[in-house]
Design a protein with these regions (language model features):
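PP2C/PPM-type serine/threonine phosphatase catalytic domain
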Residues: 1-214
Length: 214
């Protein structure tokens, strides 16, 4: 709640959100969490991910950001792309070639994250820039969804042509039906109109501070 409150306070004062606003919100949320907890709970933190509408060189883009293992996916032309990279022990094992990506979810350390908002320390987000294109869908979700619903199932739900709200409801229902072992969040965002800006750019460049792996 602290993260949502702080990020929304910055977003409602302007049409577009920049990286400075996101990072200020995360710093303030970290302070809020520290004030709300007693000394025994100072190790408590939360993950955060999202997509903020931003301006880059006069053009609208999504600024995608994450801290932890919640994710943002892009669905377009029947293809599902994971935009964010988890800050987790198992992701580091995958990157190092120790385990396969398909084995990460069942690994005993799958719930151990290497970055979070809280812990009485600065949150360090990673950033990506995604062009705003008509027909594009974004899925913003917690690991409570992705641990229960595999990648192909996610793609099929997003491809079904239902409204953003109905798709999110059905994704949560699928996660609950599969066991629902963790908190489940799913938000689907559709781009229904576009000015044509960014229509020819199919890349997802990373921007902002050079990311570090915890």
């Amino acid at each position: 709640a602290a993260v949502v409150n702080r990020l929304s306070q910055g977003a409602v004062t302007q049409d577009f959100t920049d990286i400075d606003t996101i990072e200020r919100g995360l710093r303030e949320a970290t302070d809020d969490i520290a004030l709300a907890l007693d000394e025994k709970e100072l190790g408590v933190g939360t993950t955060v991910t999202g997509a903020a509408l931003s301006m880059l060189d006069g053009e609208p883009f999504w600024t995608v950001f994450n801290v932890g293992d919640s994710r943002v996916y892009l669905y377009e032309h029947n293809e599902l792309i994971q935009v964010t990279i988890d800050h987790s022990v198992v992701q580091e094992l995958v990157d190092a070639g120790v385990i396969r990506a398909e084995d990460a979810e069942s690994h005993p350390d799958s719930n151990v994250i290497t970055r979070a908002v809280g812990f009485n320390m600065d949150a360090i987000p990673d950033y990506w820039v995604v062009p705003v294109r008509r027909g594009l869908r974004l899925l913003i979700c917690s690991d409570g969804l992705t641990k229960e619903v595999n990648r192909e199932e996610l793609r099929l739900h997003l491809a079904a042509g239902r409204s953003a709200q109905q798709t999110a409801v059905e994704l949560i229902g699928a996660a609950l039906a599969a066991g629902g072992r963790d908190n489940i969040t799913a938000i689907v965002v559709d781009v229904v109109e576009s000015t044509g800006i960014g229509e020819s750019d199919n890349t997802i460049p990373r921007t902002g501070p050079t990311p570090t792996r915890g």
